[in-house]
Amino acid sequence: MVRSPWFIPSITLTRITVFGFPNSPNQTQNLGFLDQRLALQWVRNNIAAFGGDREKVTIFGQSSGGYSVKQLFARPPNPLPFRAIIMESQATSLSSNGGDWNKLVNLTKCSTARSQFQCVRDIDAKVIKAIIETNALAFTPTLLDSETTVKNFTNAVTSRTTAQVPLIIGNNQDEGTAFTVDVTDLEKYLSRYYYDKTVRDKIISQYPVSEYGSSAYHRASAMGRDIAYQCPTAMLANLTAENGIKTYRYLFNASFPNNNYSFFPDGGAYHASEIYEIFGTYNRTGAIPRQRDLSVVMQTYWANFAKNLEPGVGWPRLGTNGGLDVINFGGNESSTGYLISQSSVDRKCTTFWDQYLSTS
């Protein structure tokens, strides 16, 4: 991604799963988010030693990293350690209710310990990791923490308590394919999102066989994309733009044979596939000219945004340019991006999903 000598990348590692988000009662919550704040403070205190300017920091993240960036935007540290943000495929959060912590306590036989938290901490981390993976425990952030998260994102934006900084936000066309390859039962798949039977039936009717084919894989993929990524991204982008925040939105819709995986066929522009283009780490073997061109264009836009607080010519702010204000990276018309309307990609969001989803 480093295409200019003035760009200094700083990549941080934070705790995840139970190590970062244990959700244990009466303990500090969202430790992983606290790690990120500490890392930003370190950058603020030390980036000058590397030739950087602490007043010109742009933060960006993808997937759970995009969600982390969203929460930093919603409840910013003081003093503000960044001046711009990029959210790639920021996922809507299913906030933890502590259920997985209780399961882990039982699985580790710590339920009768005087301190369940200390009992779990005393167990080797590799053992804990194996238990989590074997039992598919998902330790996610909690919105009950008033230090690093907000519960009502809409109120935060409209009340101007978020960071007042420009942002790039977007998602991929086929976000769901990587997560739904084994789906054969749509009812069962939707139950993980906690929708009741009546709502599940309505959702399934929105993704008919006539439009998506008979494969549960492709129908579930489209559902997952809209539930977790596409529609929350659309809602958040419009919310920020309507409240005076410079917002630039993209859709990544490019796929290349040398980035495909055999374990989820017809993956398309799958979750995280844009990272290869942004960092320039795509497989050079089999790379085609338009793949190389797209990588250069996306890297240039990202770097321009970090330097100038706008991506540059050809990518207008959301809410301008007569409605053609979303840049489509890929697709059929241009290998390096062209402008489309939100209505062309958000149809199901505005006609159906907005009643069930939120920006949080």
PLM region spans:
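Mobile gating loops/cap/lid regions near enzyme active sites that modulate substrate access
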Residues: A234, N238-S360
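Active-site rim elements
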Residues: Q27-N30, Q90-S93, N106, T154, ...
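Alpha/beta-hydrolase fold catalytic core
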Residues: D196-E242, T247-R249, A254
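A structural signal for well-ordered alpha-helical segments within the folded catalytic domains
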Residues: L34-Q41, Y67, G99, L137, ...
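Substrate-access "cap/lid" subdomains that shape
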Residues: P79, A84-L190, A220-R225, Q230-E242
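C-terminal, loop-rich substrate-recognition/catalytic regions characterized by aromatic stacking residues
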Residues: T162-Q206, D346-T359
